[in-house]
Amino acid sequence: MNTRIFGLSVSALVALAVALAAGWFLLGALGAGTVAVLVLALYYAIPAASFNFLFGSLGVFSLAQAVFVAVGAYTDVYLYNVYGVSPWLSLLIAPVFAGIIALPIALASVRAGTGAVLTALITLIISEAIPPILIAIKPLGGAIGLYVKTKANPSFWDMQFGSGVSFARMFLVLNVLIIVFMMWWNRSRFGFFVRAIRDSPDASAAVGIPTARMRILTFVIAAALAAPAGVVFAQYSLETTADLFLGGTALFEVIVIALVGGAARAWGSVVGAVVIVYVANAMSNAANGAPGIGPLTFAAVFVVIAVAMPRGLSGTWALLADRRRRAAGGTLASPPAPAAEPEARPVDDHAHRATEHDVASG
Amino acid sequence: MYLEQLLLVGVLGGAVLSLVGVGFTLVIGVGKVANFAHGAFVAVGMYLGYWIGHTLGLNPYVLFVPALLVFTLIGWGIAELFEWRGRKVGAIGELLVGLALLLLINGLLSVGFGPNPVTLSNVEMGSVSVAGTRIPGSEIYAAVFTLVVGAGIYVFLRGSRWGRALRAVAENPQSAALYGVRVPIAQRVAVTGSIALAGIAGLVISPFSVLTPDVGTNFLITAFAVIVIGGVGNTVGAVFAGLLIGVVDSLAIGYLSTVWTTLGPLLIILAFLLIRPVPVEI
């Protein structure tokens, strides 16, 4: 039987630790070109995980997650340039800022209604509104953005590394931390609350779940998860501009990666990111770096996913795993796969609910 | 004088936004599909006009009727796609398809026409002078087109049996079905009509617009603003909302700094959403 620590299965934790260690050493052995691709993939995986966290647990389709990455990046570069605050410290400060900024956005989307489409449109408007605001704020460098002040002999605390390997490793660690957090969340009381809210807002309010508060809390946590990615990415690219994070393609790439990965498993976003960034890079290389090929590949892969597997790679995996387990005569041990749509859930919904209930009370 | 010019430009620009918004309000109200690619079809129409004018050297309006037919066919295909995904996966499936189409169209336009903004400069359609402003003929045609189409849609929705069926579906699909309205057909008609309208609107405004591959996203946001201000499924409200946005936009460009011209409309939408939330679950 699966032993658990704080609700986390030990075998999953061991698998994660092995993956982390393998990734850590593998990154050291790869060529610079591959590392650059992986840095990008592992960076995108974080806002994508933040999106999947919201979408998977609460069913909120937020296009604003890139905003919180930008908040992280601007926080880091501004604090470092003006006050000399170490980026390592910014890793802790940025989530707080992102959470504060997420609060009114969460309020607006909760107030406007619960429909996924409406939330998607509102958050799209917010992400389109942020760049002009950022550009209008003079200390943040306007349209040019901010450049990290580089040092000739940077110390460890300046987080300026010559090679991409260190950044890739940092992104890897951040990803693993987020996966662990999401695994814990799914098994915790909060996880059950938000899934109940997603499946039936009225019923969960009736049994005493503070629905509005849980919605806002989840939104704020998702924002805090996305912010550290901005800090590290700003240090990696040594600059931060509104376009870098919120430009037409950058904004949607996060969503595409998240949906390709799927929200059914915590690792979905990492796998989705590595697959899609690798494919887009390969296609771009095949076209001799012709402009627009990368985004077009993203779009093409997304079309395939949207039509063929709307729950993403990890959603399909979860579906197959459950089918296999049922064929073997076992019970559904995995946490209920967040279905894309409550009405479209499998028929054996009662089995899911029963498991949830047992774990919640036990 | 300056104010009058700004108002005139605003009304002309707003007329087109109304048209895009009328389509969007139909697709959400009747089709119950939030087609994220709605604005992208405007972009397709614009680039089609650019291609006709720039590559073929023709007046884009010459190919108005064939383009309308093509957009209607494409629209029907997309409507089937939405219907299929909606049946299989629900509203999220439709959302994904819309988003995927938006990105695909943005990507294709960017690869096909380059990422930089382009304008169609070699099409001359004369001009008229109103209130001291020289207004290009194409803008007059666009405004007349909007007026005719807007009035046509109004008469269709109010006067015809089909229009009544569409309004019934917008009001309450279940009851409409009980009364014998073929709801799936009505929804397909709404989606098809909105896409055809969006594409043709794009073709009509192509001679006097700046074209960028991701212009579709901007039109999506404007269309959303139109339904937020005008009400879901309310075509008359959509027309007024479009005009309002056009005028506000034009005044903002005339009197305020550039920050406000991009930010202003977005803030208006957010304010409207907070004061008067959208009544329908979408």
Where are these regions (language model features)?
Chain B
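Transmembrane alpha-helical segments of polytopic membrane transport and secretion proteins
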Residues: 1-2, 78-88, 276-282
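Inter-helical junctions in multi-pass inner-membrane proteins, predominant
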Residues: 1-16, 157, 161, 190-227, ...
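Helix-loop-helix "hairpin" substructures at the membrane interface of multi-pass membrane proteins
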Residues: 13, 19, 131-211, 235-241
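Cytosolic-side transmembrane-helix boundaries in multi-pass membrane proteins
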Residues: 112, 171-185, 255-282
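Transmembrane helix-bundle core of multi-pass membrane transporters
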Residues: 85-159, 186-189, 251, 256-257
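Alpha-helical transmembrane segments within multi-pass membrane transporters and channels
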Residues: 24, 57-101, 108, 240-245
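Pore- or pathway-lining transmembrane helices of multi-pass membrane proteins that form conduits
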Residues: 40-44, 51, 86-110, 216-228, ...
